[in-house]
Amino acid sequence: MPKARELEQRLERTEQQLRLFQKISRMMVREMSLPEVLQGIVSLVVEFTRCDSCLLYLLDDGELVLCASNTPHPSTIGKVRLKLSEGLTGWVARERRLLAISRETYKDQRFKYFGDLPEDTFEAFLSAPVIARNRVVGVINVQHKQPHQHTGDEMEVLTTVGEQVGCLLVVARMEPAALENANHVQFVLSSAPTTSRASGPA
């Protein structure tokens, strides 16, 4: 029975992951502003991970800028900035690696203390780079007030969400009219390797 129950729980968690990715994908294709979509994604991540804080930073002129958050600090959106050499967030962007700390995050030598953010005292920290076209364009952080052992599911989810946000940012740079009028077939075929274009059907 314990094994059966464990399998049920794993299946349920997998289904929750799929629903999360589906919700994010649907949000990405709706007619919503980019800030609204990013805010919606942050809310979905909070719901899945049951974290106390989720912050999304995007890269701007060599600095990471806070662009979305589930916690009420509207005055800090667009104003909190980190250099790539600063803090755990900067480390994740610089190293292009997932980072998980289960307790006493504030004692890590890489930690940057802001002084006016509640997250300064949070215990657990999970962070993943936002990747677009194989380049880091941001970082997404999940934090818990209390010590928290991050699961493999949570790490996988945050990594995938980082990739989804990266795809969203690439598409968001295109004007709607340009997207509608684009010759996608020609673009795909012209982007294919020469050998692929030259070979015919088997």
Question: Where are the regions a protein language model picked out?
Answer:
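Signal-transmission linkers at sensory-effector interfaces
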Residues: M1-R30, P35, V137, L168-A198
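Amphipathic alpha-helical coiled-coil segments that mediate homodimerization
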Residues: L20-M28, S33-D52, L56, L88, ...
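GAF sensory/regulatory domain recognition
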Residues: S43, S53-V80, L84, T105-K107
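Short beta-strand-to-loop transition segments that serve as allosteric relay/switch motifs
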Residues: P72, V139-H148
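Signal-transducing coupling segments at domain and membrane junctions
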Residues: P74-S75, S102-A124, H144
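Acidic/proline- and glycine-rich, intrinsically disordered low-complexity segments
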Residues: S75-L99
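A short, aliphatic-rich beta-strand micro-motif
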Residues: E123-I131
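Allosteric cytosolic regulatory segments
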Residues: T159-G166
